[in-house]
């Protein structure tokens, strides 16, 4: 399960981390003791020990999260609240640490990109037209001692337990959608799931904060029909939004290139929840992105220049993916050869070579909202280069207020390495055009760094 603070949940395809090397630096955090945030020192002094596994994850994660909260300007009291939640509600649900194996449960392979820590951070950038700071969220994969065993072959039990327990302190948490999609997406013969061969190209993690359908005998990713039938079975008002999306997928030239790989939802009352369908495409041209983000011309605006917004978004993709300046609008961004990946070419083509999108088919909407994900190709850019390109783009948009904080945060997360030597802190950068025309941008960051 992938859970985000703030009650929303989402997931994306994992990236290739086969060559990842993590350097934690001093105190396991990549920062000197005197640089430790005040809120972290307070929690660390006052909270009692909860065993070696808890101490292991707290030692790694808390300094990183505390740094991000500090650099985004969260008040100290809010930092204390979030770190206390981390201590009592997040850390206990990370993988048990076995002797000599701190990476994951010995029976379960994490879906999340980092092979070292089953979590991902996100930094949602501030908006120029709104008086607010960046938002920090933490995505985790929930584990239990029996994850991956015959009792819980798809690692679903810990997620349901966490949702149940959180409902006692967060009244808005609701398990209806989790139970519904769990019933629709999976068979219920644990013995047969254990007997099936492991499919390394298919995410084994299922009941996350998003779900990936997996029926017995299924090869590869589930077809769109699996998602559509499960959503329709809810009997809600999302029908017309879903119909619009399926019509686009069946009539647009880009539809055949979009492949579903997951569904995300908020664990709240179904009538209030977003329903986000995730797709990947190997197409990376401007024309392809434009077709998808406008839903074939169905999404437009009379209050701002949609074409200008789309070109601004694509300029960021070009910067981050190393696109030649003279690339034609109908030409994909060249995929440079990978020299040190151990993953197969098929896996790379499936999950990493192109763009990713989600479509929100929430009840009551006429058209789905669309978010666009740019993969960060760590084989060809270190994290200083990625951070510099991203902050340079923000400054060009007149949104440079937190750029220095962002680069300083990256330096502090680099685990004692020079940032130019790090690869792998960034995984994706997402963009979405808000209702007011503001381009909403989020950076997705991984714990540790790669030399």
Swiss-Prot record:
Its EC number is 2.5.1.-. InterPro entries: Aro_prenylTrfase_DMATS, DMATS-type_fun. The keyword Heme does not apply. It catalyses: quinolinone B + dimethylallyl diphosphate = peniprequinolone + diphosphate. Belongs to the tryptophan dimethylallyltransferase family. Substrate binds at residues 137, 274, 276, 278, 373. The keyword Transmembrane helix does not apply. Prenyltransferase; part of the gene cluster that mediates the biosynthesis of the aspoquinolone mycotoxins. Within the pathway, the prenyltransferase asqH1 catalyzes the canonical Friedel-Crafts alkylation of quinolinone B with dimethylallyl cation to yield dimethylallyl quinolone. The first step of the pathway is catalyzed by the nonribosomal peptide synthetase asqK that condenses anthranilic acid and O-methyl-L-tyrosine to produce 4'-methoxycyclopeptin. 4'-methoxycyclopeptin is then converted to 4'-methoxydehydrocyclopeptin by the ketoglutarate-dependent dioxygenase asqJ. Pathway: Secondary metabolite biosynthesis; Alkaloid biosynthesis; Mycotoxin biosynthesis. One of its GO terms (biological process) is alkaloid metabolic process. This is Prenyltransferase asqH1. It is an enzyme of class 2 (transferase). The lineage of its organism: Eukaryota, Fungi, Dikarya, Ascomycota, Pezizomycotina. Keywords: Transferase. Residues 14-37 are annotated as: Disordered. GO terms for molecular function: prenyltransferase activity. L-tryptophan binds at residue 120.
């Amino acid at each position: 399960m992938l859970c985000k603070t703030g009650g929303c949940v989402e997931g994306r395809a994992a990236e290739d981390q086969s060559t990842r090397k993590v350097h934690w630096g001093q105190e396991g955090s990549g920062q000197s003791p005197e640089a430790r945030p005040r809120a972290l020192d307070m929690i660390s002094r006052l909270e009692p020990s909860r065993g070696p596994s808890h101490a292991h994850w707290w030692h790694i994660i808390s300094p990183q999260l505390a740094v991000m909260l500090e650099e985004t300007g969260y008040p100290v009291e809010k930092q204390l609240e979030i770190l206390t939640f981390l201590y009592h509600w997040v850390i206990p649900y990370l993988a048990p640490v076995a002797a000599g194996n701190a990476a994951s449960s010995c029976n379960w392979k994490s879906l999340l990109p980092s092979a070292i820590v089953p979590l991902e951070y996100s930094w949602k950038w501030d908006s120029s037209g709104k008086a607010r700071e960046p938002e920090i969220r933490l995505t985790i994969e929930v584990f239990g001692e029996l994850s991956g065993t015959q009792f819980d072959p798809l690692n679903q039990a810990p997620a349901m337990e966490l949702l149940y327990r959180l409902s006692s302190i967060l009244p808005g948490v609701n398990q209806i959608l989790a139970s519904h999609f769990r019933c629709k997406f999976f068979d219920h013969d644990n013995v047969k799931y254990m007997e099936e061969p492991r499919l390394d190209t298919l995410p084994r993690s299922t009941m996350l904060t998003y779900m990936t359908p997996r029926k017995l005998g299924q090869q590869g990713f589930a077809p769109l029909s699996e998602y559509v039938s499960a959503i329709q079975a809810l009997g809600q008002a999302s029908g017309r939004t879903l119909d619009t999306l399926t019509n686009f997928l069946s009539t647009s030239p880009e539809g055949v290139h979009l492949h579903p790989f997951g569904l995300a939802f908020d664990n709240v009352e179904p009538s209030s929840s977003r329903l986000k369908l995730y797709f990947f495409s190997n197409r990376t041209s401007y024309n392809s992105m434009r077709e998808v983000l406008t839903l074939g011309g169905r999404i437009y605006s009379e209050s701002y220049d949609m074409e200008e917004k789309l070109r601004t978004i694509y300029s960021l993709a070009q910067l981050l993916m190393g696109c030649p300046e003279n690339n034609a609008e109908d030409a994909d961004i060249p995929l440079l050869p990978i020299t040190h990946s151990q993953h197969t070419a098929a896996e790379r083509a499936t999950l990493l070579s192109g763009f990713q999108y989600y479509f929100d088919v929430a009840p009551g909407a006429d058209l789905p909202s669309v978010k666009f994900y740019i993969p960060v190709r760590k084989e060809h850019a270190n994290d200083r280069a990625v951070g510099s390109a991203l902050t340079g783009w923000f400054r060009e948009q007149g949104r440079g207020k937190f750029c220095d904080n962002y680069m300083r945060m990256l330096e502090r997360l680099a685990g004692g390495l020079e940032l130019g030597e790090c690869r792998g802190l960034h995984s994706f950068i997402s963009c979405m055009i808000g209702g007011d025309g503001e381009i909403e941008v989020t950076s997705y960051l991984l714990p540790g760094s790669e030399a």
